[in-house]
């Protein structure tokens, strides 16, 4: 039959994506360095596990994995969509066609002109087990969360406005779990690998994945409302379509280059920005047209009557989540909006924007989560909830913690008080939902109570978030070999710092507290490909209540410490000093240009080599073409009517989200005669601050901080994950009966 033939043709397309994926893995393990993707993200000494995960280390491989996940999700969707299959699969094939078009523009199989003997290597901060599993879980979440959009579009086209929601609920549950797990895995990776002491930095690219998860959460609650009460049909269709559009928008922000100066995760423009922008506009127009056509036939939300407490709770929670998603989306899109209004001066918002707008909403959300298990779908829910409050201590604890919010805000100050209030409300929400989970499990079985366990996990997460932000702030310390220093309650002693021929730096320390035996700790710094600094991994001392976080920022081996500074370079007369930089994040390097205050010239640092003591620059005069220069220390080059001098390297810095920033001090002056030659016989060296000589033996710079209750955060993530998994099992069982 024709439908059966269409199914087999689609399976054939899924097998084709599988074959392409197997081919890419074969190239990665076969060290096919004539393939640009293999050369850019692997090397001969890369362990097999990271050769496997290099598949999604770059944008081209990520697109292919997303297409692979979407292809096989579609195979299951074709069976699960039942009578909506023709319309749903038509839309799904359009989604897969978009991914295929992006792969044709950015193919992971593009060839180089020659075959290098070795690859450039994988960024050290990507060589981590958490990062090996974080991206595929995220892309699986993107694929699964797209299913409700396909079913919603099918429901609109076929006028089956109830049927699509029944079929979508299991997929929305699985998408919520997968995308949420991906976000958590990224947070764990950031905390344990990047060394900035946090797990969420409000980076625009991180936010762009959070927003569809938030709108998907609204959709999930709305689908439950529609299943139980037959309401929320209009907002459900809107949020199903909106979540898919936000997934496309997230991809556009990440890969269009618009966030290149605002995110350490962003890729440069990959050539698909026009395609993605066009796809977003086209899909949005199609969705809007179908909605306008069918909207009058979609039942309006019913008026909530007195006593329908749980339904009101769902609506209020959805409004709060929508408000959080709006503010996160607004802050994330600020670089794009300001770039359109002022192309030469795009700007972004600071993390404080998200904290200020999100904290009150988070407090309100926790109150609603704490009240949820005390309500029911019964019209008499208000009386039942009141009786529950009187009978149960968890309910009283939730109400009591809510009453303490204003008192604590005034007593402890707004920020600290808000964090303590957040922790108390999280405790109340967790307690109330755990109590309801146990009670419902005994009455109806464990899977039926999974949502309450997930809510309890969310409450615990906020307890951990609040506690970890109330710890001792970073305290920096610099140690020379053989030196001991006390930081907080800890004593740190540096035994040695050594470098290897491969450029890896190893520091050996003894860390002790009081009369406890000293811990022997080994810290490593691995060079980032391209000679653009080092990636340092922190040491975390874990205990039941608090993590102590030791984050290295600089490690100088003994042989480099022993060198004496060469005579300082004499700057050009009348020169202005600029400090262009290269910023290296988990997704690669990006230049950070420096412009003269009068706009006469911009200097971009393209590459730097500490070993040879040279830099590669692109000098862009205001009234002339760009000029590419390679300069050694002290050397002067000519760019139009300007003399450009490389004076010395700036300090290596590590940003708040783990990115490395390497700069160079460049002097620019009006040209005077012939540019002088570079100083001869100068030994390449690394500058010491202020020209001071360091004692031989090596040195390390470390910051120490504490993270109270962060273990509760990870526990909450695990509890929420288990509860979500139980809910997914329940919804798919129910879906099989629909």
Language-model regions, residue ranges each:
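Solvent-exposed, non-transmembrane regions of integral membrane proteins
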Residues: 1-738
């Amino acid at each position: 039959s024709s439908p059966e033939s269409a199914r087999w043709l689609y399976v054939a397309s899924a097998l084709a994506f599988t074959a392409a994926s197997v081919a890419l893995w074969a190239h990665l393990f076969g060290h096919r360095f004539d393939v640009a993707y293999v050369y850019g993200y692997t090397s001969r000494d890369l362990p097999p596990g990271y050769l496997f995960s290099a598949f999604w280390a770059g944008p081209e491989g990520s697109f292919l994995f997303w297409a692979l996940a979407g292809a096989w999700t579609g195979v299951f969707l074709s069976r699960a969509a039942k009578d909506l299959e023709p319309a749903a699969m038509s839309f799904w094939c359009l989604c897969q066609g978009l991914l295929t078009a992006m792969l044709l523009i950015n193919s992971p199989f593009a060839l180089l002109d020659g075959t290098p003997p070795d690859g450039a290597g994988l960024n050290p901060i990507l060589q981590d087990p958490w990062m090996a599993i974080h991206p595929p879980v995220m892309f699986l979440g993107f694929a699964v969360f797209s299913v409700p959009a396909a079913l919603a579009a099918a429901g609109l086209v076929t006028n089956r406005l109830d049927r699509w929601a029944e079929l979508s609920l299991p997929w929305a549950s699985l998408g919520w779990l997968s995308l949420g797990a991906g976000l958590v895995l990224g947070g764990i990776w950031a905390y344990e690998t990047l060394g900035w002491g946090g797990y969420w930095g409000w980076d625009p690219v991180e936010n762009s994945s959070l927003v569809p998860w938030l709108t998907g959460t609204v959709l999930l609650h709305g689908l439950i409302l529609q299943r139980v009460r037959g309401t929320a049909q209009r907002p459900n269709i809107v949020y199903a379509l909106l979540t898919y559009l936000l997934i496309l928008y997230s991809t556009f922000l990440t890969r269009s280059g618009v966030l290149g100066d605002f995110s350490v995760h962003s890729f440069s423009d990959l050539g698909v920005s026009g395609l993605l922008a066009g796809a977003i506009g086209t899909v949005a127009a199609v969705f809007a047209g179908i909605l306008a056509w069918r909207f009058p036939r979609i039942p309006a939300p019913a008026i909530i009557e007195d006593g329908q407490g749980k339904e009101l709770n769902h609506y209020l929670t959805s409004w709060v989540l929508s408000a959080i998603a709006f503010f996160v989306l607004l802050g994330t899109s600020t670089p794009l909006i300001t770039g359109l209004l002022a192309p030469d001066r795009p700007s972004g918002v600071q993390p404080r924007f998200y904290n200020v707008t999100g904290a009150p909403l988070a407090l309100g959300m926790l109150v609603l989560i704490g009240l949820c298990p005390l309500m029911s779908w019964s019209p008499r829910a208000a009386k039942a909830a009141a009786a529950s409050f009187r009978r149960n201590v968890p309910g009283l604890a939730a109400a009591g913690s809510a009453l303490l919010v204003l008192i604590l805000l005034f007593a402890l100050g707004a920020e600290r008080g808000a964090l303590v209030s957040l922790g108390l409300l999280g405790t109340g929400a967790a307690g109330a939902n755990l109590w309801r989970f146990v009670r419902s499990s005994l009455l109806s079985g464990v899977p039926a109570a999974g949502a309450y366990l997930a809510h309890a996990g969310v409450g615990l997460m906020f307890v951990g978030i609040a506690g970890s932000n109330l710890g001792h702030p970073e305290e920096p310390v610099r140690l020379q070999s053989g030196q001991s220093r006390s930081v907080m309650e800890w004593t740190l002693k540096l035994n040695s710092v050594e470098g290897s021929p491969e450029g890896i730096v190893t520091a050996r320390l003894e860390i002790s507290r009081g009369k406890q035996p000293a811990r022997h700790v080994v810290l490593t710094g691995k060079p980032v490909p391209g000679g653009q600094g080092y990636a340092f991994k922190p040491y975390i001392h874990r205990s039941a209540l608090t993590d102590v976080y030791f984050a290295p920022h600089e490690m100088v081996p003994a042989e480099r410490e022993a060198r004496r500074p060469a005579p300082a370079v004499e700057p050009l007369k009348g020169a202005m000093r600029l400090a262009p930089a290269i910023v290296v994040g988990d997704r690669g390097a990006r230049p950070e240009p420096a412009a003269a205050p009068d706009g006469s010239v911009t200097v971009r640092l393209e590459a730097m080599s500490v070993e040879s003591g040279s830099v590669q620059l692109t000098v862009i005069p205001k009234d002339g073409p760009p000029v590419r220069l390679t300069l050694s220390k002290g050397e002067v080059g000519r760019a139009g009517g300007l003399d450009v001098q490389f004076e010395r390297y700036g300090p290596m810095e590590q940003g708040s989200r783990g990115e490395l920033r390497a700069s160079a001090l460049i002097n620019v002056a009006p040209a005077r005669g012939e540019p002088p030659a570079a100083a001869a016989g100068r030994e390449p060296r690394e500058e010491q601050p202020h020209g001071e000589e360091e004692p031989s033996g090596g040195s390390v710079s470390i910051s120490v901080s504490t993270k109270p209750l962060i273990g509760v955060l990870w526990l909450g993530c695990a509890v929420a994950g288990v509860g979500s998994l139980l809910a997914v099992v329940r919804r798919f069982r129910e879906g099989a009966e629909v």
